[in-house]
Regions:
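Low-complexity intrinsically disordered segments
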Residues: 67-161
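Intrinsic-disorder/low-complexity loop/linker signature
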Residues: 16, 26, 35, 42-43, ...
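Tryptophan-centered short beta-strand motifs
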Residues: 17, 48-50, 137
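Short beta-strand scaffold segments in enzyme catalytic cores
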Residues: 4-9
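Short, solvent-exposed aromatic-acidic interface loops
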Residues: 21-63
Length: 161
């Protein structure tokens, strides 16, 4: 289902000013990605406090939220994921970046699929927003208006609620 979300990371101060590049070999749990997109991904120079990508499919807590908690458990794996840019889906065994389907190129004039950067904490711009901060996943959206511990929420709510 096209329940859209955003995925954000509170950037470590030590990473500001550094340049990162998506690396398929650093994906957790034997995940792969749409190979058509890898050569289109550019470098990401971190200049602000938060990185955010758009995620198109299954953005609800028991969809992408569950994937984030179960597969993207540490800062470096999340940073690598976000350096891959906007995604159609990270659920399942294959990550499909947005540019794989749209043919978008990363260059100096087009940043449409690169992670967005901000100095302010992300707000909800889609149905759900996810944030990795202080070693934990948080979310807000339809069910909750304030940042809520995602793992605790998943442990206490079924996907049928």
């Amino acid at each position: 289902m096209a329940t859209r979300s955003t995925i954000s990371l509170k950037v470590s101060e030590s990473d500001k000013g550094k340049v990162f590049h998506f690396d398929e070999n650093k994906l957790p749990y034997n995940l792969s990605c749409e190979n058509k997109c890898i050569d289109k991904m550019g470098d990401v120079k971190i200049e602000k406090d938060y990185l955010t990508i758009f995620h198109h499919w299954d953005g609800y807590p028991h969809g992408v939220g569950k994937t984030l908690v179960n597969k993207f458990k540490n800062y470096n794996s999340i940073l690598n994921l976000l350096c891959g840019g906007d995604a159609s889906s990270i659920n399942g065994k294959r990550i499909v970046q947005y540019c794989a389907w749209r043919g978008d190129e990363w260059d100096d004039n087009y940043g449409g699929v690169q992670p967005k950067q901000s100095d302010t904490e992300p707000s909800v711009t889609e149905e759900y927003a996810y944030l990795f901060k202080d070693g934990k996943w948080f979310f807000k959206g339809y069910e909750v208006e304030e940042w809520t511990d995602l793992k605790e929420y998943l442990e206490t709510h079924t996907d049928e609620e």
